[in-house]
Amino acid sequence: MMAGSTTTTTAAVRVRGAGRAFAGRQVLRGVDLDIAPGEFVALLGASGSGKSTLLRAIGGLDRGFTGTLEAPRSKAIVFQEHRLIPWISVWRNVVLGVRGRDLAARARTALDEVGLSAEADAWPATLSGGEAQRVALARALVRHPDLLLLDEPFGALDALTRLKAQALVARLWQQHRPAVLLVTHDVEEALLLADRALVLRDGRIAESFDITVTRPRSVVDPEFSALRRRLLLALGVDPDAPTGAQS
């Protein structure tokens, strides 16, 4: 059984020997993973490799695992779908499930951090896709998580909105410094945001890349380009192929 969510003094997340099978198919096989407090880790791999499965385990959303897991009690998850409730206002979505006083003020503070304080009383249906994802980020931030789990949060956004959302996440991470696990298919996104990029292959963490490129990062930086090439090769993608072949 997976161990209950607990805090650890040496790592924000500690996974040992995690395994998961669905209908007889082994998706994860003895995964080991450590994420330090305040570290930003990106997890990449082919579709169906188990990236989101591992994230859900760390988030406490799936108990059908073998192995052991330690993670902070204070954690929040942002999915690709914003999952806002349409019949309550934006600010009430932000603090849904949060206890304590001054919830409206706390919601507005979180919305201000993502540039949406003016939309606090709006209905979710009036928001663009990018705005809705920013509300989802505010909903995570208002909980002051020690661990932020991002499951392809920009996957449904257009290219320009995606770049703006990436920059926002980078800024918010630098401000609040939670540990972050980002599941993504986008190599450049991983290299722009993370301290470390992991490749999940055959049910295990097959490769790990330390990203030492100075922030803020640029895709035209030669060091960035060299690391991008190595990471694409690790993912089984030809880095010299046309861009469309890498998506």
UniProtKB/Swiss-Prot annotation:
Localization terms from the record: Cell membrane
Name under which the protein is recorded: Aliphatic sulfonates import ATP-binding protein SsuB 3
The ABC transporter domain, residue ranges: 13-227
Pfam families for this protein: ABC_tran (PF00005)
Keyword Membrane listed: yes
GO cellular component entries: plasma membrane
Catalytic activity: ATP + H2O + aliphatic sulfonate-[sulfonate-binding protein]Side 1 = ADP + phosphate + aliphatic sulfonateSide 2 + [sulfonate-binding protein]Side 1
A GO MF term: ATP binding
EC number: 7.6.2.14
Enzyme class: translocase
Keywords for this protein: ATP-binding, Cell membrane, Membrane, Nucleotide-binding, Translocase, Transport
Residues binding ATP, per UniProt: 45-52
Subunit record text: The complex is composed of two ATP-binding proteins (SsuB), two transmembrane proteins (SsuC) and a solute-binding protein (SsuA).
Purpose: Part of the ABC transporter complex SsuABC involved in aliphatic sulfonates import. Responsible for energy coupling to the transport system.
Record-linked InterPro entries: AAA+_ATPase (IPR003593), ABC_transporter-like_ATP-bd (IPR003439), ABC_transporter-like_CS (IPR017871), ABC_transporter_ATP-bind (IPR050166), P-loop_NTPase (IPR027417)
Entries under PROSITE patterns matching the protein: ABC_TRANSPORTER_1 (PS00211), ABC_TRANSPORTER_2 (PS50893), SSUB (PS51291)
Keyword match Lyase: no
Name of the gene encoding the protein in the UniProt record: ssuB3
Family that this chain belongs to: Belongs to the ABC transporter superfamily. Aliphatic sulfonates importer (TC 3.A.1.17.2) family.
Membrane topology designation: Peripheral membrane protein
